[in-house]
């Protein structure tokens, strides 16, 4: 899921009162941190999501091409800044597998309906997916405000990530001929108000709705054909961590992605991985092995 997101605070400040005050920067940090991870440094949290992927192209109906099962294992650590105060940084790994929309079995290969070419499926294995620190004061010095909405006992927290940047597969002349990576990810979190504001609890039982609008995945080999993909999924934090994930994900982690049982270290300084950079690594490794 990519994915990127939010911020929070340290355990001593979050637990110093019985109720988190969303109107204060410290309260905003604590609430965001409870939704995203935990107010306890180094406590692993697992998000799971399940959904569908549709192909969308001009002039033809949308087509259900994949189901998906995904997870993200994360932890947060407290950070401080002399000008911006106390905050936190989130580190994570993210795995999402593509499933046959009829059988719900893991896809290892896929037949491109436009070309009838059988291609290897490259699942999402982004390690790491880390966030920038968030502090009690923003970059311009303003006090941090909680961006969620409280209504009828629920807290709703929307987050949109418009993505437009140089495509790692697009060559050296994108500023002249185009081909930038252009996508949108939308994360909508929801949590019970009493759960979120309870300062004695380090984590919230949060739910998430995730939408992604993106170009064709590079492993699909769609070339320059017009169109793209729409992802739609819902999920939540897992009370039992990795053990609470669906069997298909647990089996895939055990067999092919053993590092995904734990998050990266809190001091992880690696650049973030994306579906496009991961595909490049897989493709380049296979091409080198074939030579």
Describe these PLM feature segments.
Residues 156-291:
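A eukaryote-biased signal for long
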Residues 1-13:
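Gram-negative bacterial Sec-dependent N-terminal signal peptides
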Residues 3, 16, 41-43, 92, ...:
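Generic detection of intrinsically disordered/low-complexity segments and helix-coil linkers/edges
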Residues 51-198:
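Predominantly extracellular/secreted and cell-surface proteins with exposed
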Residues 18-95, 232-291:
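N-terminal segment immediately downstream of the Sec signal-peptide cleavage site
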